[in-house]
Amino acid sequence: MTSRDGYQWTPETGLTQGVPSLGVISPPTNIEDTDKDGPWDVIVIGGGYCGLTATRDLTVAGFKTLLLEARDRIGGRSWSSNIDGYPYEMGGTWVHWHQSHVWREITRYKMHNALSPSFNFSRGVNHFQLRTNPTTSTYMTHEAEDELLRSALHKFTNVDGTNGRTVLPFPHDMFYVPEFRKYDEMSYSERIDQIRDELSLNERSSLEAFILLCSGGTLENSSFGEFLHWWAMSGYTYQGCMDCLISYKFKDGQSAFARRFWEEAAGTGRLGYVFGCPVRSVVNERDAARVTARDGREFAAKRLVCTIPLNVLSTIQFSPALSTERISAMQAGHVNMCTKVHAEVDNKDMRSWTGIAYPFNKLCYAIGDGTTPAGNTHLVCFGTDANHIQPDEDVRETLKAVGQLAPGTFGVKRLVFHNWVKDEFAKGAWFFSRPGMVSECLQGLREKHRGVVFANSDWALGWRSFIDGAIEEGTRAARVVLEELGTKREVKARL
């Protein structure tokens, strides 16, 4: 089925909005009469991985649960579109067995053999292309590419002589060493200034492109401490970063994974749902919560799990008012305004290509990520807020940015993308914090507010902003509700 989300361009059709996805849910609701179908034990707002995990856990535990989702699909900021037999990851892609929460679910759903590697250096050009200006390129082997980035990242992270292990020994407890707060408050640019004399020109260009790929922001507004947190979660090594961040994906796309959560919850017979249902306001007390949708429909439950992303929370009216700490974080928002563009290109040898075009190009980092059924190469390309592009507003500019990654080597047969910056239900891509934001706001964002549990990957303790972090948070939220409402009697009886 086709979602309203996403864009596709081909030379024959031009730009069209809406792409097919396994995540589209039809019919869009199984609720005919809110009074008849209620009352609900729990309402979950948001059908991303956090909301899906909470919904699955609560329905399996015996609770009558209502899922409200603004979109026409599940997955939130992590979903895929299958076009002509090939999955394009619109947001969220890579997973790894070092990400314990997501791997628990992969084994639960017997999908351990459903992964494929993004990189394939077995044929084709088999090189890395570094472009620091529009007219020249430096080519090197992938081994040299690894050494270049490894050297640069080790210099960047080595604030303590141990590549961050001393100042951040427990990544899930970031401020176990109080000194770490100063790194949370430090920007990328401030850290680069400290090591500028140690970096070669190629190291600096590659480093800046890579870390901006991670944050989606600018050198000035991205927290160095947040990158150190990613680094620590990856095992404090360059290879760990590459393995955990950009190496392994689902053969059939993220939405195939999300469907497993959905189908298990629906199979309990305790799931109600309404898609295309943006929320306008939430009124909550200690033992009840009432949600009003934009169209005026009202829903009530004993507890509410709110999984709305940080950059969207300010669009919802909460009564009683939220804490000043949470409001401050909502008003500031995270910095990630990443652009992610998929390009199907007619050069099959680009499958083993990787490249950086920075700082001049609006897409700064790309890799050969697969081969389509037509025999073309799939490139996944990223841009950041440092040199931003709105890919749907000027396709010619987008095509130019793709072409500038490796000029004269391919023709573009298809573009596929989701504009996360203009998406009213995301207002940006994955979470990445401003300097000082985590130390100031993380705890406040995680606090319960009367009958409402706030849960989202944006404030996870571990793989924050990742699918793993979303599952971590959904698990936590469901556990809070279970502890407060107790185990349902009918489930205990079956046990």
Swiss-Prot record:
Organism: Aspergillus niger
Subcellular location(s) of the protein: Peroxisome
InterPro entries from the UniProt entry: Amino_oxidase (IPR002937), FAD/NAD-bd_sf (IPR036188), Flavin_amine_oxidase (IPR001613), Flavin_MAO (IPR050703)
Domain of life: Eukaryota
Protein name as catalogued: Monoamine oxidase N
Reactions catalysed, as given in the entry: a secondary aliphatic amine + O2 + H2O = a primary amine + an aldehyde + H2O2
Keyword Transport tagged: no
Major subcellular location class: other
UniProt xrefs under SUPFAM superfamilies: FAD/NAD(P)-binding domain (SSF51905)
